């Protein structure tokens, strides 16, 4: 009798221990799901041949070894993708180092989760393992879609709708609600499945032990989602103000409102004067930068070398360095991705003033950030993204004037191309347009903030840039489809399909 009791206690202790391990592993798996798109679903399917290979051989060392090997391969896949995000020109970006530190968590969490699945298959049989793996796959899918980091093909319309929200409210709610709710559901499912499949009598406090493991997951999720925003606020990036108007129109308003920002941006052609003929531009920019106590970027025009051509230029003035610098437009339309109906582009008129291509530059603004500047249609060329990323900017800025494109469809296509550049470079893009959409596009290609009403009275767009960068492989927007293939930080190929529906 005593031996049977001891055996029963041993079995119950084993079951309760598994409950806690499964709860913690499931919660950690859900928390880490979605960092790299699609790998969660791929991994849940890939472990089936390994289970079949060790079926009927309850060697726990073999089980743990297979689980560790599989988790190592899975983590290496994540590592390759993360390294591709952060490793450029022989060094890691500062943002990627934090992501690389999560590899240890991936190894521990997924080793425990996969080993528990092996244990379920060998000891409990395939129905219990199937139920557990189904809940795991479901949790990965829900977490990927809710956190907007996976492919999310079935949730594509939801992602497009929520990408228009101001300030990324949906992402913040999903971080808290999605991770917490899915962890709760997975843990409860684990406990119910084990209770239904258990062949030995369980003690009365078995479910209480399962609740303890579930509370650990909930506390972990709550702590992470509460501490993370506070930590990011202490390490937030620069504050940028986009002023979609002519130079001088809102200067009095900016000075009276006493806006505290690191950078003020005016669109292409905002300054009516021309450099090389009137040097008052530098003086006016210096006075404004001193009053606002911030860096300034303003679009203007200047004559090229030898007074032969007209350059579209961005002027930059920093009150810290007291330096005035210029960045010229690199490319001229026709736009590379767009194809006209007849298959040929019109010739550029006015050959008396030929276009002189310039070079884009990166500038350091207040707060220690480096920004890369593109003018007009520069961002529609893939070569611009590749050349500007060689200078390691942390933020991309595009100033434009879309008065030349009265068609709303053309403006949508331009906006879709800017989203493509954000995905390809994995950098946020601030777009300040004289006419058109002034917006903030994050590294996933989602429009976080926008101001469509460009007509007077002009509305300022104030953006607080996040410190971290996110990325994606797939993005669709409206009538356009963009696909970027990357490996090791190098763009291997890209595809853009832009429809030409007539406006109704």
Question: Locations of the language-model features?
Answer:
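Membrane-embedded alpha-helical bundles of multi-pass enzymes
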Residues: 3-231, 235, 406-407, 418, ...
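Conserved hydrophobic/aromatic beta-strand scaffold that supports enzyme active sites
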Residues: 31, 242, 314-316, 326, ...
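Alpha-helix C-cap/termination motif
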Residues: 57, 123-124, 199, 257-260, ...
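Active-site catalytic loop in hydrolytic enzyme cores
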Residues: 81-102, 131, 135, 141-179, ...
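CN hydrolase (nitrilase-like) catalytic-core segments centered on the catalytic cysteine
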Residues: 133-134, 152, 263, 271, ...
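Residue-level detector of flexible, active-site-proximal loop/helix-junction positions
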Residues: 164, 247, 303, 331, ...
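Asparagine-centered polar/low-complexity signal
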Residues: 190, 312, 398-401
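Soluble catalytic regions of membrane-associated enzymes that act on cell-envelope
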Residues: 222-336, 364-367, 373, 377-379, ...
